[in-house]
Amino acid sequence: MAKLENPILMAKIGGAQGLRGEVRVSTYTDDPMALGDYGNLVTADGRVFEILEVREGKNVVVVRFRGINDRNAAESLNGLELFIERDNLPDDELDDDEFYYADLEGLEAVDAEGKSYGAVSAVYDFGAGDLLELKGAGRRPALIPFSEAAVLEIDLEAGRILIDPMAAGLIDNPDDKDQNGMSPFGKK
């Protein structure tokens, strides 16, 4: 059993594939075929899985793990999430404007005056562009676009992101109000 200090979700096991213990796996890696390049995978309860083989499947990869040799054993893994330690991710391959989602979580979102809008609690990718979820004390969670217009600067060492709250949709543009003081969203 292994316990990870800073776990990063890499994959989720689906159903069994065939009779020899292979499983279908959805990966959260840039290259699904590279899943085995990160070392052993660990479940939330500390079980360690060594990848013996990875091959392409339809919309997934098909993986064979050491010690999983038949369909019954493979079926027992259905739904398991697989993690690695954050330190196993290669930082040297990132460009200056690239970040791992896990590194963004916990960063405080502030504007140019230093006003806090909460901390990044999650990063979502729905296909049309990434969104950052901000949560703060006394505030409802808010989703902001992870775009150059909304997120002006990311400072991992300082633990903060500099945002433009208007571009992020957190405050109204005063120029958008009509003569009655109403914004296009029906707010004063």
From Swiss-Prot:
Domain spans labelled PRC barrel: 96-169
Alphabetized InterPro entries for the sequence: PRC-brl_dom, PRC_barrel-like_sf, RimM, RimM_N, RimM_N_sf, Transl_B-barrel_sf
Membership in a protein family: Belongs to the RimM family.
Annotated GO CC locations: cytoplasm; ribosome
Role: An accessory protein needed during the final step in the assembly of 30S ribosomal subunit, possibly for assembly of the head region. Essential for efficient processing of 16S rRNA. May be needed both before and after RbfA during the maturation of 16S rRNA. It has affinity for free ribosomal 30S subunits but not for 70S ribosomes.
An annotated GO BP: rRNA processing
Chaperone in keyword set: yes
Stated name of the protein: Ribosome maturation factor RimM
Main location class: cytoplasm
Pfam families: PRC (PF05239), RimM (PF01782)
Keywords: Chaperone, Cytoplasm, Ribosome biogenesis, rRNA processing
Molecular function terms from GO: ribosome binding
Subunit structure, interactors included: Binds ribosomal protein uS19.
Organism this protein belongs to: Agrobacterium fabrum (strain C58 / ATCC 33970) (Agrobacterium tumefaciens (strain C58))
Domain of life: Bacteria
This protein's domain notes: The PRC barrel domain binds ribosomal protein uS19.
Matches recorded under SUPFAM superfamilies: PRC-barrel domain, Translation proteins
Subcellular location: Cytoplasm
